[in-house]
């Protein structure tokens, strides 16, 4: 069976939308539709219910999804091990990272390069949810992301992240050490990060809003934190972002106010798949 078809199946199941899935796969929507129909024909099973709101897994599709993920995982591991046998002198590690690890990952990689100059490290920026997916199927050897994680993934905490309220400096009315910034939710709309771009952060933000009984006016969804901050800087609303966003925000126009209470802090660490052995990673 063509693993490309299985990969298309898994990505579409994850996104639930042909447009988003085709972007991730770098193919056209008609090509993706053809791949899914080909797989359904081969299996003689309807995997998705198509509708105006996207693609939803059928009961049969849901049942087969886990098996498809297992096959892809083993396929990636086999390909990687085969490459290492053919070219054992070329050793590479593949690492995922996000904004929350940006403050320390460069110095960490520089130190690793001094210790192991013959091992190249390829890094890729992605969401924590995507990192976990790629670790599970063997596409990443290690990731620097949020904790905790579920087995077989394991992690060690390296630093702590905090939820902040990003607000245009022009909108700030009071800046006192003991002042609660939650009142800004009453007057300013919220600019959210699209859930598919940061699923865990999106879930945490909603948990925070529910915990504090906040129901802000939702203005729009952004595809990345940089765009969120740009919209905030323009005075179009407020946003909930990790503290590490201070590395990329316009500090003259945007102020980050710390939030306290439940769902405002989480740990960032190094994560790996304990089911996949890798001597270079485990050095």
Indicate where each model-derived feature is located:
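Flexible hinge/capping segments at coil-to-helix
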Residues: 86, 157-191
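A short LG(V/I)-centered, amphipathic sequence patch enriched
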Residues: 40-57
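Short helix-boundary/capping micro-motifs
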Residues: 10-28
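Alpha-helical linker/hinge and terminal dimerization helices associated
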Residues: 42-43, 64-86
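Beta-alpha-beta core module
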Residues: 151-157, 161-162, 226-275
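N-terminal winged-helix
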Residues: 29-30, 87-116, 120-125, 129-133, ...
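Short beta-strand-centered segments that line the small-molecule binding cleft or hinge
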Residues: 66, 107-111, 124, 128-168, ...
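Secondary-structure junction motif
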Residues: 188-212, 278-280
